[in-house]
Amino acid sequence: MSNYRDCYFDNRGPFNEFEGFYSIVNCQLAMMKDYQRNEGLFKAIKKYCKGKRVVDFGAGTGLLGVYALMNGAKEVWFVEREVNLHPIIENLARINGDFDNNVDYHICVNASQIPDQKDYFEVCISECVGDSGIEDTMTYEFGKITRKHPNSICIPDRIEYFWSSVYVDEVEKEIKYMKDFPINYVDLFGKDESPFCPMNAMRGCSLRGYHNIIENKISTLDLKNYPTEPYVDMRFSLNNSSIEQEHNFIVLHWKCFTEDLEILNNSPQRHKDSYNHWLQFGFRDEGFKGDYSLYTNVHTGLVNLLKYIDENDNKIIQGLNFKYK
């Protein structure tokens, strides 16, 4: 899911056609509307859950755990902290399955209430993925569960990060708009020195329909061997000779896998008419050359974009806190 908290959404920008404050049901509906997300998760559940003991961590309305029951899981534990969703999970399981008498399922508030026996669960499921790949503290908590069940199948078991260069018409429109703006923002810190024209900080975006991009691997976050240290330095290098001349924006995106099966992504290669409930993040830096880092707190989801000036010094282009209110 994206980083929703306390049943409302901040004012960073329109989520889709429906703006304003969101209830927890709106958040769940937004995930259900992401067809590609559902297809990937369902494919993995069909492949791995039959006859298995399953935990669905961050269960929401119970969508994934119920689908596991429908596909032959013998036992499912739903872990969802929002107790107002528990009746929905119960009813969803009731109306969607004529389950065998041997099938068992449980609904609980947190992971302390699930069986603590090592390797009790054979499949660990969580849509513990946010806009930046990491979903607040949820991904970290899922990592704790997977450590207790090292022989389990994890859906997903890793997040792979990429950067790609693209041409975004909106960037050029913004530059022209700011140059024509009646108040001079262009020369804030000297001639043509401004953070606004173009905006050179990391920012949220929702790019789709870029089918011919080159995906450049940044790093992999292993969800079965989750980092115990809070910060991970995901470094990558840009070389302007490898970026097409007309490209004006770097988009950062990710893919999630279970073994060799890709199940989730927020790639700009998605069809332009598809609905993607995740944002991407990206930036524009004049010259597109140098060493960068997604300096990430993998316990909280806080991500900074750094640009390294040399080996001993670094410059923060912008640090973004991806948490909501």
Where in this protein do the model-derived segments appear?
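Class I SAM-binding transferase module
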Residues: 2-57, 62-325
